[in-house]
């Protein structure tokens, strides 16, 4: 007995020393047990409703109203493919915040890893397209006004916008209807009959076909060898180089023509000056003595006028008339 009590006392002391930790552990265990009981009661109450339906989420024992009521629309209200509002189960007056919240909820349901009946990669990609269109005010306004930007038939990634889809569709249309889209292998005429209109069709265009053709009219092909209409970079650079060379040649030609015209003008001026000088020399040689005589006469007249002016002023005495001599008595 003494040995047994001796062995028991240390345990009692140790239990007293660790009593606060043990108390905390008991309280946490009690709380966990209560939560497990409440979860068991909730799951048992909803077992009758969930027994007929598969679990809508992994590790979740309850279902919200959206998961129970939502099914991905295969057709829209008008009979065609569903629009983005129908895909996201939203009204057209939904706000941006409502669109964002609805997207987060539907992404969990339509994800390929989800157990929802509508979960699939295609539905998840369509949901991403709808969210990308409705999350931006510009694309949403354009869709509401014109209807453009939404095409369920095209397979695109989740990060692709409606403008990218339109661009890809335009490139595909140009590729199918490119410059070489008219397949020459399906022509129904000989090469010698090219360009004869309805009797032979246009060369390489499958235009107006022969009259025995059942279609009896113009029916362009829907596919071709996929040659783009737009020009490649080497061809574009070649065209730019040729155009630059032509423009440079034109400017060089104009510059040479202008220089030649200026040179001709200077030559003409020199010729005119030479002719004027020769004419002046000829007139001086022919009528020089007459002009010299006229000049001398004018000079003498000027001198006479100056002498008369001086005489009037009294600087020069004017000679009187000659004296008359008496008659001689020689007679």
Curated annotation (Swiss-Prot):
Matches recorded under SMART domains: DnaJ
Localization of this protein: Mitochondrion
Region ranges (Disordered): 35-66, 203-226
Biased amino acid composition, Low complexity: 40-53
Inducing or repressing factors: Induced by high temperature (at protein level).
InterPro entries: DnaJ_domain (IPR001623), J_dom_sf (IPR036869), J_domain-containing_protein (IPR052594)
J domain: residues covered: 83-147
IQ domain residues: 275-303
Annotated organelle transit peptide span: 1-36
Keywords: Chaperone, Electron transport, Mitochondrion, Respiratory chain, Transit peptide, Transport
PROSITE patterns: DNAJ_2 (PS50076), IQ (PS50096)
Main location: mitochondrion
Consequences of knocking out this gene: Decreases electron flow through the mitochondrial respiratory chain complex III. Increases level of depolarized mitochondria. Abnormal cell wall structure resulting in abnormal capsule attachment. Sensitive to iron starvation. Abolishes cell population growth on non-fermentable carbon sources (glycerol, lactate, and succinate). Decreases cell population growth. Decreases virulence in a mouse intranasal model of infection.
Assembly with partners or alone: Interacts with QCR2.
Function comment: Mitochondrial co-chaperone required for ubiquinol-cytochrome c oxidoreductase (mitochondrial respiratory chain complex III) activity.
Name of the molecule in the record: Mitochondrial respiration co-chaperone MRJ1
Organism (species): Cryptococcus neoformans var. grubii serotype A (strain H99 / ATCC 208821 / CBS 10515 / FGSC 9487) (Filobasidiella neoformans var. grubii)
């Amino acid at each position: 007995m003494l040995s047994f009590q001796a062995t028991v006392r240390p345990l009692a002391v140790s239990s007293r020393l660790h009593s606060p930790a043990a108390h905390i552990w008991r309280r946490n265990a009690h709380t966990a047990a209560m939560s497990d009981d409440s979860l068991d009661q909730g799951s048992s109450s909803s077992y009758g409703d969930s027994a007929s339906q598969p679990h809508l989420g992994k590790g979740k024992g309850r279902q919200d109203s959206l998961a129970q009521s939502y099914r991905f629309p295969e057709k829209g209200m008008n009979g065609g493919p569903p629009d983005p509002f129908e895909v996201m189960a939203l009204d057209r007056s939904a706000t941006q915040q409502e669109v964002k919240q609805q997207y987060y909820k539907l992404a969990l349901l339509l994800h390929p890893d989800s157990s929802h009946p509508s979960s699939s990669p295609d539905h998840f990609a369509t949901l991403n397209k709808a969210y990308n269109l409705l999350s931006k005010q510009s694309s949403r306004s354009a869709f509401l006004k014109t209807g453009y930007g939404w095409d369920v038939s095209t397979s695109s990634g989740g990060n692709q916008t409606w403008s990218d889809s339109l661009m890809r569709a335009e490139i595909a249309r140009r590729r199918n209807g490119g410059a070489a889209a008219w397949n020459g292998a399906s022509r129904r005429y000989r090469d010698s009959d090219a360009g004869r209109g309805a009797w032979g069709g246009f060369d390489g265009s499958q235009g107006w076909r022969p009259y025995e053709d059942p279609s009896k009219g113009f029916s362009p092909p829907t596919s071709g060898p996929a040659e783009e209409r737009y020009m490649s970079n080497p061809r574009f650079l070649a065209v730019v180089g040729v155009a630059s060379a032509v423009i440079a040649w034109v400017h060089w030609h104009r510059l040479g023509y202008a220089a030649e015209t200026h040179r001709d003008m200077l030559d003409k001026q020199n010729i005119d000056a030479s002719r004027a000088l020769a004419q002046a020399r000829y007139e001086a040689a022919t009528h020089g003595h007459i002009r010299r005589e006229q000049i001398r006469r004018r000079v003498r007249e000027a001198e006479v006028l100056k002498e008369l002016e001086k005489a009037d002023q009294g600087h020069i005495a004017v000679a009187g008339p000659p004296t008359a001599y008496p008659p001689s008595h020689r007679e």
